[in-house]
């Protein structure tokens, strides 16, 4: 049983190595980092202008709905896409990169939760 388990793990890692190049992985990581950096910049500009920041409610938007910050989108791997500002989850058409990107987004969302208030 242990040999079968090890074989499955090795096969999965080999498939991941062939499916995703390091450039694709670093591009996905850079995209996720820039999304959270944009949240910070938008929030900082509001505070800098002395305006009362809009009250953002954590997990108040579903996938496909309009959003302003990542923390508004429901789902551990959901983020606010920065072109049309809608909640989405898909990072890449490559399933391995998509899974990796969703994991990175989930970690980033855990860090950036303080931008939104709990309801």
Swiss-Prot record:
Keyword Disulfide bond: yes
Location, primary (coarse class): secreted
Taxonomy of the source species: Eukaryota, Metazoa, Ecdysozoa, Arthropoda, Chelicerata
Domain-related comment: The presence of a 'disulfide through disulfide knot' structurally defines this protein as a knottin.
Range of residues in the leader sequence: 1-19
Subcellular location: Secreted
Protein family membership: Belongs to the neurotoxin 25 family. ICK-8 subfamily.
Descriptive protein name: Toxin ICK-9
Disulfide-bond pairs as recorded: 59-74, 67-80, 71-116, 73-87
Tissue/organ expression: Expressed by the venom gland.
Function: Ion channel inhibitor.
Keyword Phosphoprotein applies: no
GO cellular component, one term: extracellular region
Any one GO MF annotation of this record: ion channel regulator activity
UniProt keyword annotations, A-Z: Disulfide bond, Ion channel impairing toxin, Knottin, Secreted, Signal, Toxin
